[in-house]
Amino acid sequence: MKKQVLFLMVIGILFSCSNDDENQPQTIDMRINHYQNTGIGEGLFLTLLVQENNNIGSDSWTKFYNSIEGFNYQPGFIYNIKVIVEQVDNPPADGSSLKYTLQEIKSTQEVNYETPFDIDLKINGQSFITTTSGYELLDQIEIDCNNLCDELDTKLQNQDFVIGTFKRLQSNEIQLIELE
């Protein structure tokens, strides 16, 4: 009987020890959309839009607030990439607990400049439009508001949520074609 109890205790101890699989680097597939969207974290950001693993090819895109070490994103292209995801020991209070590193660019597909896409211009009263030198998204992407400048100003003043539909003019310049 004592041997059985001892055996069960040893088995219990072995199974209770953590394997720390969570801390092992993982490799995942990602698809990165051809345009960035806006987001709110510890401030206002331009975010990549991504799909991971089984979600690749779906209509669902997630805002990605991290960076991918070794990846040089260029607007106007959809990227299929493979990344290594690692746990960060003792991450900063305002930082991520995950580190993403590019392992491989599997494919790159250029998207037609006429392809429309939506960007959140204002979320919960927080506007992402800056006017330091014309209309821009967070002083990073120029916006040609076309004949919609007055409507854009009015919506930014009076609505808590504003979404713009755009098309690409150049790498870092987009044209507003519709507002909601």
How would you name each of these model-derived features?
Residues 60-70:
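N-terminal post-signal-peptidase region of extra-cytosolic proteins
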Residues 23-45, 112-130:
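Structural detector for short beta-strands of small beta-barrel domains
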Residues 92-112, 170-180:
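OB-fold/S1-family single-stranded nucleic acid-binding modules
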